Amino acid sequence: MPLAATVEPLRAAAGQVLMQQGERAISFLLISSGSAEIRHVDRDGVESVGRASAGEIVGEIALLRGMPRIATVTTTEPLDGWIGDNDAFTLMVQIPEVMPRLVRTIRQRLAAFITPIPIQVRDGTDLLLRPVLPGDDERTVHGHIKFSSETLYRRFMTARAPTPALMHYLAEVDYVDHFVWVVTDGSDPVADARFVRDPNDPAVAEIAFTVADAYQGRGIGSFLIAALSVAARVDGVEKFSARMLSDNLPMRIIMDQYGAVWEREDVGVITTVIDVPRSRDLHLGRDMVSQIKRVARQVIEAVG
């Protein structure tokens, strides 16, 4: 049966509730015109609001996961679209390339519900910590924050600028096997830290950091390894591995604080493996650890 035969037209006035958080999911909606607000309330009562417009699908998250709806969808203007049930959704996900795109959308829409954590770095600058989101690759490449060729060389161990495909990969994560924290100035990323789980040993994950030149020397790298450690503990990662250029002294100093023992892998390249630091060993206040743990758990449990 063709997909078109399994969906029905929907027309809704502004202010109409189309889906309710917590209710059983029996349908999804493909928006053809208009827009809707997506409101999620987490277990702590914190509200997050997103938006869906023409060309987007809503309601697919609960259908894909076989769980109650995680958000309330309310039209913000007159809306037209197509509504389908489980059978229609099953047909849709069988279309080539649809399922991977849906999964990416689901993961990143859920991550967008997470409230950024305000942080203050060594010199008093106020920044925000949050999971990586769609568009961060574009904001990193084309935003007002600059990353010098030397900074990129230390991060990627090559003189060539990272390709668009690599930048896309770095921003497309599952938050479980590939988790990324981003520090922003309120708009563009100024730093990121990630762990990528070893497929042969899920208890081990490789870590990497990038800090924009104008923000180096402010303790952001030290803060990020602490934030990454909290997330890793939530996610069941027990050891961090690192591979870097031997002259990357800032990174080496950070890792040395947690007992790194370095081995030479190649000319100018060194590696180490450390135990993921425990909360009591991190230079973070109890409240900050609690906030980071809460956000990490939210994104890992909801998105992974």
Task: Kindly give the residue locations of the regions a language model identified.
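Conserved GNAT acetyl-CoA-binding A-motif
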Residues: A232-L245
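Terminal substrate-recognition subdomain of acyl/acetyltransferases
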Residues: P100-L102, R107-T125, P131, R243-G304
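Acetyl-CoA-dependent GNAT
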Residues: T158-A203, A212
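Conserved acetyl-CoA-binding loop-helix of GNAT-fold acetyltransferases
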Residues: G217-V234, I253-Q257
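Regulatory nucleotide-sensing modules
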Residues: M1-D44, S48, V58
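Cyclic-nucleotide recognition modules
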Residues: V49-R104
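A short, internal acetyl-CoA/4′-phosphopantetheine-binding micro-motif in the GNAT/acyltransferase core
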Residues: V58, T74, D198-P199, A208-G217, ...
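A short beta-loop-alpha structural element at the N-terminal edge
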Residues: L128-R139
